[in-house]
Structure formats: C-alpha cells, structure tokens
A protein has these predicted regions:
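Consensus positions within tandem repeat domains that build extended binding/scaffold surfaces
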Residues: 8, 28-30, 50-53, 73-76, ...
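Structural signature of tandem-repeat unit edges
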Residues: 1-2, 8-25, 35-48, 58-71, ...
C-alpha cells in the first residue's frame, strides 16, 4: 500500500483499535472529541499531525511520536486536559497552540 493521507470517520462508535501503519498524515479533526482515547502511539512514517486532530480528547494521557514526525499542527492536542506525556524529537515544527489547555503536561 502506498503511503498517503487517510481519513477515518468513526460516527460516535467506541474506539477500540486503529491500524495507522500506512498513515503519513493525521487529518484535521480526525480524532477530536474522543473520550475513549487514552494512549496514542503513532507509527514510523507519520510526518504531520493536522490541526485539531486530537482536540478535546479529555482522557488522553500519553502520546508517543515517531522519529519521522516533522510537524504538529495548530491546536492538534488543545484541551487534552489529562495529557501528561508528549515527547518528540528536536527539530519538530510545533505550533504554539498545539498543546494549549493541556494543564497536566509534564514532558
């Protein structure tokens, strides 16, 4: 499968498992307002996280970014109030609003 943009529509179903092995771009708003997301581990190959991609995921606690990541969009994780860990490599372009409202963010 060729790497490219993939967008998933979930229609308010409970999120159990998502295979993102062929994602290179996480679309805008793709997982916004998901209270069932607790941990995200993005696979190698993901280069960009779109604006508001994980906005208001209020139970999200941890994000693991791949070394391939180059950019985190505007408000990508805004108001993820339980997010405690989000570690990315030096040189990643991070919008100043990417983690706005993440009041428990330690790293």
């Amino acid at each position: 499968m060729k790497r490219g943009r993939i967008k998933v529509t979930l229609y308010n179903r409970t999120l159990k498992e998502i295979d993102m092995s062929d994602f290179s771009y996480i679309s805008e708003d793709i997982f916004s307002n998901r209270s069932d997301v607790v941990k995200i581990e993005l696979p190698e190959g993901v280069k960009k996280i779109g604006n508001n991609a994980f906005e208001n995921c209020n139970n999200l606690e941890e994000v693991i970014f791949p070394d391939s990541l180059e950019e985190i969009g505007q408000e990508a994780f805004i108001n993820c109030v339980n997010l405690k860990s989000a570690v990315y490599k030096k040189g990643v372009k991070v919008d100043p609003t990417s983690f706005k409202g993440c009041i428990q963010l330690e790293t």
